[in-house]
Amino acid sequence: MPVYIRYMRKIFTCIALLLCILQVQAGQSNGLTEYKLDNGLTVMLWEDHDQPDVQGWTVTRAGSIDEPETATGLAHYLEHMLFKGTDRIGTLDWEKERPLYEHVIALYDTLAMTEDPKSREAIQTRINKVSREEALYSATDEFSNLIQSIGGEGLNAFTSYDETCFMNSFPGYQLERWLTLYSDRLIHPVFRSFQAELENVFEEYNMYLDDNSTHVQNFVNGHLYAGHAYARDIIGYPEDLKNPKLRRLIEFYDTWYVPDNMALILVGDFNAEEAKPLIEKTFGRLQAKPLPVRKVYPQTDFSKDERFAAKLGYMPMVEIGYKGVPVGDKDELLLDFVTSLLSNSMQVGLLDKLVLDSKVMYAWASNDSRRDQGRIELGAVPYMDAATQQYHSLPETEELVINEVEKLVKGDIDTALVAAVREEFYQQFDRTMEYPQMKVRLLEHSFVYQQPIEELLQQKEQVAAITLADIQRAAKQYFAAPRKTFEIAEGNPKKNKLPKPKILPLTPPKGESDYYARFDTIPTGHLVPKFINFSDIDQDNFYEGVHVYCTPNTQNHIFSLRLKYGVGTYEIPMLEYATAMMNISGVKGDPGMTSAEFRARLAQLGAKCTYSVTDSYFLVDIEGDEQNLQEIVSLVNLHLLFPNFSSENDVLLNNIKGQEYSMRQMEQKNTDMVADAAMEYMRYGENSAYIRRPTLQDVLELTDTQLESELHRALDYELEIHYAGALPAMEVKSVLYGRLPMAEHARPTQSPIDRPQKPVDKDVVYFLPDATMQQAKVYFLIDGEPYSINDAVRYMAFNEYFGGGFSGLVMNEIREKRSMAYTAYGYFERPPVQGRTTRFVGYVGTQSDKVADAVDVYMSLLDSMPEYPATIENIRTMLRQSVLSNKPTFRKKSERLTSLMRLGYAIDPATLQVRQIQRLRFDDIDAFYRSHVQGKPVAILIIGDPKLIDQKQIKAHYGKITKLSKNKLFSY
């Protein structure tokens, strides 16, 4: 249940971009229905029978903006609590549970009025005692178990500034059960295990604060939205989290979770006419209530230029904020367009050119419109001079950004750029309409911001009508106005570490409510399995080592083309830097093309191209207008064969070197990168990607000719060509043949790479001390057996039982019962090729002072797995739906085919697995556990604060602790 803190700006930007590019084409809005129930609930239905399942959401127009200022975090905490059930769901005996629940509410009232620390601690202890008694009559995991019982997947929720959403996917034949369950959760909810869940919220809080970008965004938002609820974290202030008010939570629910403030959204494979009476029968039961008047916040002061500075970043950056507009303003769409003239996915924006010209390292621009206010945000990271190993100054970087903005203000606007951005908007909508999740997000946005869907679906014409005069008017109005500028220097933010609470875990019995039994009697439809049909993929070979796959696109005019060369950084380490150069380089020749000119030419053709690399593959991804396929492919071919890596004063090459120097300076400060490097070391030893990579000195000594040589070496390898588009396969192949780099006698690929792994042949504990971490990270590793597709269902069944989301043992024992973690998991990885060794990977993210206890609990699950045979029916249902709904989009269909072929499948595995799942018994899971997990050596990796982790307890239980140092994990 993520709270969107770090990525709020990105999410708003993506939604804004989606809304900018909407267009009506035949069939795109077919099956869309919107209406209201008598109680005021909005219903939005969109049939899409190309999908294998249904996306079901409930949306409430209430977020952190609606919280009392003295009780921040309520909206997000309520999101957590709405998974705990009702007076019927999740209770084994409501008559016995109810007085205990009401006692807990009263105790929290007393706690809120108590200031003496000792008295507060005594009340917290009392709350824990009563909560433990209450837990004897509850089953807090019942809601997730019920979702599992209908084959539901992706159970989740999120809270933003303006809304709270709950969602999961499910098979269409289970529609009535899903509607019943999602409506019942809103009738008399019970916020049981309030104290325990608060600890999980704290763990979520800890997780975000270990990322410096969270601190940067909070600092920027705090000033951009000063005096407004948007200025604070969605998760709430720590002082409010420490002083929770259960009654305020109940009041918040009663106030905002009313039908007139909510929407039900269904998108996917269902019949809307059949759904309507079921919706009336279920959601029609919700009682209508009036909505209160929402608080009116004052406008943040933008009357003068202001500057702010802080040492918070992994790297220096400048951010510039202007006053924007709220959602629905007449200029919202125009500002989306204007900011895309500065930065866009085609890399042809004015700020993008600064990156391509190596004047800055990174640059961005976004229009962040929200319900109440909006901001325009620009930013850049200075160029890093590899020769001096110094960043350019922030003032110099700021000046570069402002100079580009001034071009818009003065009307110095390239009409080709405007045309390219317009085309990007149109294409982006066509692409997003391929995904049911994005259709849901469109409907969600329509409801939350009260914008009629009909208007949103007419915005193509509005985009087409934007003129140069409109752009200049908006640029003058918004960019010539006062701004707030932020100079972010490198630094280490202060962290507020919270002590482990003195509470005992909940010990609920394993049981089911009467509701569960009645739920099983609700009628369902009939499962009609639909398997993947690969017969529409045209498979051919240009040469022995050059394989081409063509998949039809019947939805739009945008093709996608992936070139997948069978070599990566494992065999050619310097290919990482050659790939980076490709993304900022031009084309040799007379006259040739600069990087900006190359991308501008692609944009004129309605196309974009990106290069990437993994340890196994060098990838070229091209996307564009079908009618220009030949010209686009020819242009990319020219770039691949004749890239111009040289530049005046080697600024391009120095930019790549500077980026690598900057990254290596940052990596020991970034807890996620440190954890990844430590995990790589535990798994691969000296074969860790962080150890076997080129040294920094080797990178700094690179030449452009060396990188060009490494690139062309990669182009000699075996090649897969994956095309998805509307043109006939024969025509496509005639276009591609001879117009792409392909070797007649290609080097055979060894990919996907199977790196030699460090064996786990004895119990071992690794410890990486890091006193800066807000949240410790604990990993578990067990060697498995050579993988066979004959065992695929057994692997899936064990993974679902042991680590399957909210219903799995790991989350239930560690999060639900003991509140030790926000995130915890455990599963066997599936290798990409049969015969390669599997591995069990487990994880717990928790406060350092909880680590020793968390390790004990996790190890107890590995040593003596609890057995609940009654769960097998849910597991069968879940797995059956999982394999049936695991269908690729048409753009990824041919790559799914090749990956299945590598595993040894000739058809959709679901055709075999559905029958195997039906025969599955709990004894199969138990036998798998005993042969693959129980008694096996376990490697444990702990990363966290050495002052808070109880190393004595860990050593006493698991033996010698091997300490690691960061210097050992990274090569320099």
Name every feature range the model reports, one short phrase each.
Residues 11-22:
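Sec-dependent N-terminal signal peptides
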Residues 46, 51-64, 73-74, 91-184, ...:
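M16 family metallopeptidases and their MPP-like homologs
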Residues 196-198, 214-215, 219, 229-240, ...:
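Hydrophobic, small-residue-rich alpha-helical packing segments that form membrane-like cores
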Residues 2-11:
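Positively charged n-region of N-terminal signal peptides that target proteins for export
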Residues 26-45, 271-310, 317, 347, ...:
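Proteolytic maturation boundary segments
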Residues 184-192, 283-290, 402-413, 637-647, ...:
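A common structural junction motif
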